């Protein structure tokens, strides 16, 4: 996926080469401008067909380099037909990496512990081993014609990422109850061989900065309005952007309410060492819900 048009996703026909910046092209351009020797090795243009021989050859090639970036995920290009692993009319029975991509990552990790994984995908990928053993994972999605430039800027630190997940990543396809509207009095029974928490929850996302939250204050209700504030400190050496998220939970209700409901968020730029007070303002109606008789109430 590092040097093809999988970054375009489904429902996009074949594009001219000069109209799309692949991930390799983006990394190569920025890397060479910084004095790095950047090279590319294609394990197999068909994700489904990566073989043990392909993996062995890739690993032998990678031994000569100080840093390895492996691009894995799905390929939903409509014009590829039999080589597609995702997209419309391409159902999947699991959320794992297709073929032997995980084995490829594991073998590369054996020769270089600083492997970075870049995902190109249009759906969640459930690979707990990668989360546990790989030091850096970039979720690039199918981000379009300039995806290569965007990914390269993140990898080289020219851009400090600050995105948050718009959905939940379960640990496996069997983690069916990965929901936020179960009864607050009881989550659900434990799995025999699986954790009950997701691999990555809704709203998760890391950056090169580290943000600490403190001084959370909720005002009294005045004229059906509530004010909430929280101090956010960037205690890292990097200026960064943080998406401050405000969630609401109704602990006692006549009907089952979500245990985690996003009601407000703000994206803020916070310099290294800086503390900002973030204010949210809610109307009571923002917390309203329909009761058992379908009447709107708070």
Task: Give the location of each predicted region.
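C-terminal non-catalytic regions of proteins with extracellular/luminal or membrane-system context
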Residues: 1-298
């Amino acid at each position: 996926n590092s040097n093809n048009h999988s970054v375009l996703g489904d429902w996009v026909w074949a594009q001219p080469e000069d109209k799309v910046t692949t991930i390799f092209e983006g990394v190569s351009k920025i890397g060479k401008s910084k004095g790095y020797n950047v090279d590319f090795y294609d394990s197999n243009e068909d994700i489904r067909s990566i073989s043990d021989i392909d993996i062995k050859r890739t690993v032998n090639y990678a031994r000569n380099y100080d840093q390895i970036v492996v691009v894995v995920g799905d390929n939903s290009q409509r014009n590829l037909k039999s080589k597609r692993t995702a997209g419309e009319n391409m159902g999947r029975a699991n959320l794992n990496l297709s073929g032997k991509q995980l084995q490829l990552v594991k073998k590369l990790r054996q020769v270089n512990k600083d492997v970075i994984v870049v995902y190109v995908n249009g759906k969640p990928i459930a690979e707990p081993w990668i989360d546990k053993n790989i030091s850096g994972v970039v979720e690039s999605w199918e981000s379009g014609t300039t995806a290569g430039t965007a990914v390269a800027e993140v990898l080289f630190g020219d851009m400090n990422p600050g995105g948050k997940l718009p959905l939940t990543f379960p640990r496996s396809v069997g983690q069916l109850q990965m929901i936020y509207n179960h009864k607050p009095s009881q989550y659900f029974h434990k799995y025999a061989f699986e954790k009950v928490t997701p691999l990555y929850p809704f709203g998760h996302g890391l950056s090169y900065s580290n943000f600490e939250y403190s001084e959370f204050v909720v005002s009294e209700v005045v004229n059906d309005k509530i004010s909430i504030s929280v101090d956010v400190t960037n205690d890292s050496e990097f200026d960064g952007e943080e998406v401050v998220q405000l969630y609401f939970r109704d602990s006692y209700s006549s009907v089952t309410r979500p245990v985690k409901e996003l009601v407000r968020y703000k994206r803020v730029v916070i310099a290294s060492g800086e503390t900002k007070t973030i204010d949210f303002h809610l109307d009571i109606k923002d917390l309203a819900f329909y009761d058992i008789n379908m009447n709107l109430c708070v």
